[in-house]
């Protein structure tokens, strides 16, 4: 909110500099965006009196003006269509600086000397959104009592200082001058002179005879009140009122509309004025809109309403989008003679949603969203009615018509002096604490050291003991709180088991040639459900996504990595090996919030080894990916057996080149080639992926680490080639060899696989090297042969293999 320092001075005897006040507000109440004066960067702008005008001899749109600038009468050439003699105007003298840092010089225009410039508001820094529309095409006229030669700034409110506050969601009371006055008075210990104007009901008619209000659902409008002002004349507002508005960033429109905006700024109470004669019925109500119900708002935009929008109705016809924007059909115009004035409190959540839905974020909707002071609804309505009557020459009808009225909620909270001093580290006494609450306007009851506080309804952000402690701290002064270092022994820091796992995972995979990638956690609904380790329900959806590409939380890391691969491939980087460690979000039907799981995934495409003089190129295949996963899991030192089980059911994966990864009997991930159609959809070549659930790896039992001396005795190896059924897996053979290999078998290595010609149908050949070694002595040939023969016999019995 843009807070006028001069307006504050009307209500508070404050003598601190605006910059110092802004710093105090920032340290005590809310953040500050900016502190500025509307005249910043401008100079040599004075009041001028147009003594006479004559047409330019060589132009049909320029005028020669003789202007009294206080000391001299100078000629100024002006192109504004509304320039006339006898008016006080804004004059930029030679050497003046106007908006956009433009310097004014003496010049000739079509051969005629011009010693300055007559200015419109937009030319001296006013934005197009603030300058009154009546002067869009012309210069601004100053009051008749303005003295030629004087600075124009005081006449336009440009000598004021504006403090632009950035209000947090919990301090909606600060969206008003009243809220700012209350807070500033509290932390400076000042007495407020806030003025409330009383209403004079000088019409003989009763409001209840002119309009009726029936609120069927008070959830939509907990408070709704209305007054009627008759026999008014709609015209331009007085300059003082326009200054209040444009210094707050609001465009003056007319006396009726300007009063509602002025009261909005003063009390934080949004009001809406209807042209009484244009109301289609005199029965006012509030209801939900009908789905796709048409409605034209004040901005002349026809909108299709949603069934969750709130509308104010006359009869059953919508006349306003409640709390957001009025309707064009009942808008105030120059022909308006009677005004129906609304003051209400609407449901803040519904107002926020409909403002977002229709992209109508107004001063009113912002206040309804943050909260409106229920104490001043009627006060604001009365003052607005009186001002409209005074400025429009009308009369206020007798009484207020009330459709609904919410009871004031004033929480009572108890706390003790010892608790206050314990939490804040202070040594306050009861009198000092009570003084702070008195300055805040909070009523107190004292019982020894026990203090019971009644919070006024205007401070709806204060509800519990912690809120009161915060109020004491900020009014006492955060800078005055004692600073005490915690007393504790220092401990040597260490990584948690989770942190160590994540760090180790990164080191291992980077050592295996993969580069780390970080992808968006949000993606499309389709991609969010792809490549799940275990199938789950639908992904978590965002209510208000940034874009259609970021609507759901990922349930796998792989889709993000494939997007990264596609990005690289599109830029001619075809050899891509990436990994990502991050969280996925798994939804469960019986839980409101998704479960966050730490996962690890990798993706490989292109060549692992490039073609050069001493080695041929090697394209990534399933076994490269499997080797990386095996090496990684070996480094994790898991006690349970790691197994790879073929899976033909994963729809995003190649049915013949995919395996699930198990830790013991628990599914921990999967590995394989992505389905060719999926690769085509992502516009990438043949690609292999894997994903592991790190939560399971973290929870799994680990082997105890111990170090073993390297044997100084020689090793002996034996090779064996087996002819076996093609359905028998390498894992089965390795398990059998290790089972019967004996205590001295230290390594088994598969060095050849052959399938094809010269072999019987449905057969394949696997060749292994078995290495034997003893750390205590040299093995004999007989010892090795005995162990090797046991392996051969066992393989022959179990798998019906033929030794080649």
Task: Name each model-derived stretch.
Residues 1-198, 373-374, 380:
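Phosphate-backbone binding interfaces of nucleic-acid-interacting proteins
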Residues 2, 27, 439-442, 595, ...:
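A carboxyl-terminal module marker
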Residues 39-43, 201, 490, 495, ...:
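Beta-rich nucleic-acid/ligand-interaction surfaces
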Residues 47-77, 254, 260-329:
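Conserved mixed alpha/beta core segments that line enzyme active sites in large multi-domain catalysts
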Residues 63, 193-294, 608:
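Glycine/proline-enriched, intrinsically flexible loops and inter-domain linkers
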Residues 113-125, 134-135, 139, 312-408, ...:
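Mobile "lid/hinge" segments at catalytic clefts and subdomain interfaces of large enzymes
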Residues 188-214, 394-419:
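Terminal amphipathic helices with adjacent charged low-complexity linkers/tails
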Residues 413, 417, 421-574, 771-773, ...:
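Extended, well-folded interaction surfaces typified by the phenylalanyl-tRNA synthetase beta subunit core
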